[in-house]
Amino acid sequence: LDYIEDLGVNAIELMPITEFDGNYNWGYSPNHYFALDKAYGSPEQLKTFVDECHKRGIAVILDMVFNHATGLNPMNKLYPYGTDLANNPWFNVTPPHGDNVYEDWNHDFAPTKTMFTRALQYWLEEYKVDGYRMDLSHGLCGTTNNAMTHIADYYVNGVKSVAEDAYFILFAL
């Protein structure tokens, strides 16, 4: 970290660190949004890392994957594998944004928004991270930019309610 500080770096973005399937895919196959993945150390180690970054004036930004989940996600397991997604309100049968990766979250479903808002607040409060980079941000939306903006605003408001200066970066290719 001293070397990074000497370079003048003022922020570090970590790839997805929440629990994911296996030890491959760099965290982009998420299943639990409130748990640190086993491959990245202990909660205490992450807290120490964030504290050490902050001592050097370096912000810590987490890459969050809220557009899809794997079959190991508890909300996916509530419904038998292979059943019609139409019976599972947590996920879209067909992604409205055109990218089909794992199971696509239904961000129009109020409990989905509540769960993700709480996850964002959790990492800010428990680990003192400084903000988020949202992977495949158009995956948060319906079929229009207005829908994406509405849902992103919902999450931003949840973040700002606990950390007014937090970063919230939308990323889409």
Predicted feature residues:
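Substrate-binding/active-site clefts of carbohydrate-active enzymes
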Residues: L1-S161, A172
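Glycoside hydrolase catalytic-domain groove-lining segments
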Residues: K55, A166-Y167
